[in-house]
Amino acid sequence: VTIYAPFNFAELEINLKQALYDVKGIAAVRYPKGGELPCPAGYVPNFKPYTYLRSGKKAVLLITYGRIFANVLSAAKELLRQGLPVSVLKLTRIHPLDEECVQIARRYSHVLFFEEGSRRGGIGEYLGSRLMAERFSGSYRVRAIEDFLTTCSTASGLHQVGLDVEGIVAAVLAERSSDAPTEEPDEPA
Protein backbone atom coordinates (compact mmCIF):
# COMPACT_ATOMS: atom_id res chain seq x y z
CA VAL A 1 0.00 0.00 0.00
CA THR A 2 1.26 3.47 -0.89
CA ILE A 3 -0.03 6.43 1.13
CA TYR A 4 0.46 10.08 0.22
CA ALA A 5 -0.14 13.05 2.55
CA PRO A 6 -0.02 16.22 0.44
CA PHE A 7 0.27 19.66 2.01
CA ASN A 8 -1.77 21.71 -0.46
CA PHE A 9 -3.89 21.43 -3.60
CA ALA A 10 -0.86 21.46 -5.92
CA GLU A 11 0.63 18.46 -4.10
CA LEU A 12 -2.81 16.85 -3.96
CA GLU A 13 -3.00 17.02 -7.76
CA ILE A 14 0.50 15.56 -8.12
CA ASN A 15 -0.21 12.75 -5.62
CA LEU A 16 -3.54 11.85 -7.21
CA LYS A 17 -1.78 11.46 -10.57
CA GLN A 18 0.93 9.35 -8.92
CA ALA A 19 -1.68 7.19 -7.18
CA LEU A 20 -3.61 6.64 -10.41
CA TYR A 21 -0.80 6.23 -12.92
CA ASP A 22 2.47 5.38 -11.17
CA VAL A 23 1.66 3.12 -8.23
CA LYS A 24 1.34 -0.58 -8.88
CA GLY A 25 -1.23 -1.83 -6.38
CA ILE A 26 -3.25 0.01 -3.76
CA ALA A 27 -2.73 3.73 -3.18
CA ALA A 28 -4.40 6.18 -0.81
CA VAL A 29 -4.21 9.95 -0.52
CA ARG A 30 -4.72 11.52 2.93
CA TYR A 31 -5.96 15.10 2.74
CA PRO A 32 -7.68 16.76 5.71
CA LYS A 33 -10.93 18.64 5.47
CA GLY A 34 -10.92 22.40 5.69
CA GLY A 35 -9.54 23.59 2.39
CA GLU A 36 -6.11 24.72 1.32
CA LEU A 37 -3.58 26.57 3.45
CA PRO A 38 -1.45 29.31 1.92
CA CYS A 39 1.75 27.99 0.38
CA PRO A 40 4.87 29.19 2.22
CA ALA A 41 7.03 31.57 0.20
CA GLY A 42 9.64 29.71 -1.78
CA TYR A 43 8.09 26.26 -1.37
CA VAL A 44 7.58 24.45 -4.67
CA PRO A 45 5.71 21.11 -4.69
CA ASN A 46 7.55 18.29 -6.43
CA PHE A 47 7.12 14.63 -7.36
CA LYS A 48 9.56 13.41 -4.69
CA PRO A 49 8.45 11.40 -1.64
CA TYR A 50 9.90 14.07 0.69
CA THR A 51 11.28 17.61 0.78
CA TYR A 52 14.39 18.35 2.84
CA LEU A 53 15.05 21.96 3.84
CA ARG A 54 18.52 22.15 5.44
CA SER A 55 19.62 24.86 7.84
CA GLY A 56 23.33 24.12 7.53
CA LYS A 57 23.53 22.78 11.11
CA LYS A 58 23.10 19.16 12.19
CA ALA A 59 21.60 19.70 15.63
CA VAL A 60 17.79 19.86 15.23
CA LEU A 61 15.54 18.27 12.60
CA LEU A 62 11.77 18.82 12.52
CA ILE A 63 9.79 16.19 10.59
CA THR A 64 6.15 16.44 9.57
CA TYR A 65 3.65 15.84 6.79
CA GLY A 66 0.35 17.18 5.54
CA ARG A 67 -1.40 20.33 6.69
CA ILE A 68 0.81 21.14 9.67
CA PHE A 69 3.85 21.59 7.43
CA ALA A 70 2.85 25.28 7.33
CA ASN A 71 3.02 25.45 11.14
CA VAL A 72 6.34 23.62 11.29
CA LEU A 73 7.84 25.91 8.65
CA SER A 74 6.57 29.02 10.46
CA ALA A 75 8.01 27.65 13.72
CA ALA A 76 11.36 27.03 11.98
CA LYS A 77 11.41 30.66 10.84
CA GLU A 78 10.62 31.86 14.39
CA LEU A 79 13.35 29.64 15.84
CA LEU A 80 15.84 31.04 13.32
CA ARG A 81 14.80 34.56 14.37
CA GLN A 82 15.62 33.50 17.95
CA GLY A 83 19.05 32.25 16.85
CA LEU A 84 18.30 28.52 16.57
CA PRO A 85 18.47 27.28 12.99
CA VAL A 86 16.59 24.01 12.43
CA SER A 87 16.20 21.79 9.38
CA VAL A 88 12.81 20.56 8.18
CA LEU A 89 11.95 17.23 6.54
CA LYS A 90 8.45 17.19 5.01
CA LEU A 91 7.15 13.78 4.06
CA THR A 92 4.79 13.61 1.09
CA ARG A 93 4.70 9.83 0.73
CA ILE A 94 4.25 8.50 4.26
CA HIS A 95 4.10 4.80 3.34
CA PRO A 96 6.33 3.20 2.37
CA LEU A 97 8.70 5.56 4.12
CA ASP A 98 11.65 6.45 1.90
CA GLU A 99 14.86 4.95 3.32
CA GLU A 100 16.69 8.23 2.68
CA CYS A 101 14.43 9.89 5.30
CA VAL A 102 15.78 7.52 7.96
CA GLN A 103 19.35 8.26 6.87
CA ILE A 104 18.74 12.03 6.95
CA ALA A 105 17.28 11.82 10.48
CA ARG A 106 20.23 9.74 11.73
CA ARG A 107 22.58 12.68 11.09
CA TYR A 108 20.90 14.91 13.69
CA SER A 109 21.33 14.96 17.46
CA HIS A 110 17.70 16.07 18.05
CA VAL A 111 14.78 14.86 15.93
CA LEU A 112 11.25 16.07 16.64
CA PHE A 113 8.34 14.60 14.69
CA PHE A 114 5.09 16.61 14.54
CA GLU A 115 2.05 14.61 13.46
CA GLU A 116 -1.60 15.59 13.12
CA GLY A 117 -2.70 12.06 13.85
CA SER A 118 -2.62 9.43 16.55
CA ARG A 119 0.69 8.98 18.31
CA ARG A 120 0.01 5.28 18.82
CA GLY A 121 0.68 3.47 15.56
CA GLY A 122 1.43 6.69 13.69
CA ILE A 123 4.15 7.53 11.21
CA GLY A 124 6.20 9.25 13.92
CA GLU A 125 6.22 6.12 16.04
CA TYR A 126 7.16 4.04 13.00
CA LEU A 127 10.08 6.32 12.09
CA GLY A 128 11.24 6.18 15.71
CA SER A 129 11.35 2.39 15.59
CA ARG A 130 13.31 2.53 12.34
CA LEU A 131 15.82 4.95 13.90
CA MET A 132 16.24 2.71 16.94
CA ALA A 133 16.87 -0.27 14.64
CA GLU A 134 19.63 1.84 13.05
CA ARG A 135 21.12 2.46 16.53
CA PHE A 136 20.27 6.16 16.50
CA SER A 137 22.01 7.77 19.48
CA GLY A 138 20.32 11.19 19.51
CA SER A 139 17.04 12.21 21.09
CA TYR A 140 13.77 11.52 19.30
CA ARG A 141 10.41 13.00 20.29
CA VAL A 142 6.95 12.67 18.75
CA ARG A 143 4.32 15.35 19.25
CA ALA A 144 0.99 13.91 18.13
CA ILE A 145 -2.55 13.38 19.33
CA GLU A 146 -2.57 11.30 22.52
CA ASP A 147 -6.31 11.05 23.11
CA PHE A 148 -9.65 12.01 21.64
CA LEU A 149 -10.33 15.72 21.27
CA THR A 150 -13.63 17.31 22.07
CA THR A 151 -15.46 18.95 19.19
CA CYS A 152 -13.62 22.16 18.35
CA SER A 153 -12.23 24.18 15.48
CA THR A 154 -9.11 22.95 13.73
CA ALA A 155 -7.08 25.85 15.13
CA SER A 156 -8.27 25.12 18.66
CA GLY A 157 -7.53 21.41 18.32
CA LEU A 158 -4.03 22.05 17.00
CA HIS A 159 -3.42 24.44 19.90
CA GLN A 160 -4.69 21.88 22.46
CA VAL A 161 -2.20 19.27 21.29
CA GLY A 162 0.71 21.66 20.74
CA LEU A 163 0.74 21.45 16.95
CA ASP A 164 0.26 25.17 16.36
CA VAL A 165 3.29 27.40 15.73
CA GLU A 166 3.64 28.37 19.39
CA GLY A 167 3.43 24.75 20.57
CA ILE A 168 6.03 23.62 18.05
CA VAL A 169 8.43 26.42 19.02
CA ALA A 170 7.93 25.59 22.71
CA ALA A 171 8.60 21.87 22.09
CA VAL A 172 11.86 22.61 20.27
CA LEU A 173 13.04 25.08 22.91
CA ALA A 174 12.19 22.59 25.69
CA GLU A 175 14.13 19.86 23.89
CA ARG A 176 17.14 22.13 23.43
CA SER A 177 17.04 23.38 27.04
CA SER A 178 17.53 19.80 28.24
CA ASP A 179 20.85 19.85 26.39
CA ALA A 180 24.17 21.14 27.66
CA PRO A 181 25.45 23.89 25.36
CA THR A 182 27.53 22.39 22.58
CA GLU A 183 29.08 23.63 19.39
CA GLU A 184 26.93 22.55 16.45
CA PRO A 185 28.93 21.15 13.54
CA ASP A 186 28.16 22.43 10.07
CA GLU A 187 26.24 20.04 7.89
CA PRO A 188 28.04 18.77 4.78
CA ALA A 189 26.69 20.27 1.56
Language-model segment annotations:
Residues 21-189:
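Thiamine diphosphate
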Residues 1-22, 171, 176-177:
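Conserved thiamine diphosphate
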